[in-house]
Amino acid sequence: MSYINNPDITKEDILKKSLAHWNVGKTQEWIDRDMAIVMGKREGYYFWDMDGRKFLDIHINGGTYNLGHRNKEIIGALTDAMTELDIGNHHFTGITKALLAEQLTSLCPDGLDYACFSTCGGEAVDLAIKSARYATQRKRVVSIQGCYHGHTGLSVSTGDARFKDPFLCQGAPGEFVQVTLNDLDAMEAELKKEDVACVIIESLLATYGFPIPDKGYLAGVKKLCEKYGTLYIADET
């Protein structure tokens, strides 16, 4: 079945189905803004609305399409792989799992010998926080006001109230704490309690509007983490 230029699939029908079954808030917001885009054809760094309008995609889904939409090399690799393999089984090792893990860890500094796979950035953050808690046997997590690390279980708890409150993901009092960007004193005030498992920071806070950290701030946070036995998580997902 072809989805592009299919006369049986109309933009109006897709919008109705989206309102009825997918994300009514987001869909309605774009309709209200007179920007009810329904992505159809996509190639490289462009995509087309179902009504034929062509757009330059400078958002690239938050970096997902950094090699462009439907990159031919990626499509070829996926197609070739699917002729022999599928996702496998999470209980057993597999050829591609082992080969990819080896390749990833070969790019890391000495001592980083293992790779864990996840399906999204939020899952990766969850795994990082769980690993930090396991390694330090501490529970508290410090993040930056205005940050966004995902919408999964632990990742959403690091974010602003508008993300976590609707899902009752605030955690216990003091479990997830936010401090102001570039305020090393506020950061140290939390870390010196010596009960913080990890500090998680985006090098560039995209959802916050890309404020630039002060020179030396990130390095200063890393030094404070080392001083007080806290792990530093750089969220580059």
Task: Show which residues each predicted segment covers.
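Active-site-adjacent loop/helix segments that line or gate small-molecule/cofactor pockets in enzymes
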Residues: 2-43
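Buried hydrophobic positions in well-ordered alpha/beta secondary-structure cores of metabolic enzymes
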Residues: 18, 52, 78, 104, ...
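Active-site and channel-lining beta-strand-loop segments
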Residues: 36-57
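General beta-strand structural signal in soluble alpha/beta enzymes
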Residues: 55-58, 116-118, 143, 201, ...
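PLP-dependent aspartate aminotransferase-fold enzymes
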Residues: 102-198
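Short acidic, glycine-rich surface-loop motifs adjacent to enzyme active sites
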Residues: 195-210
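Catalytic PLP-binding core of fold-type I/II PLP enzymes
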Residues: 211-237
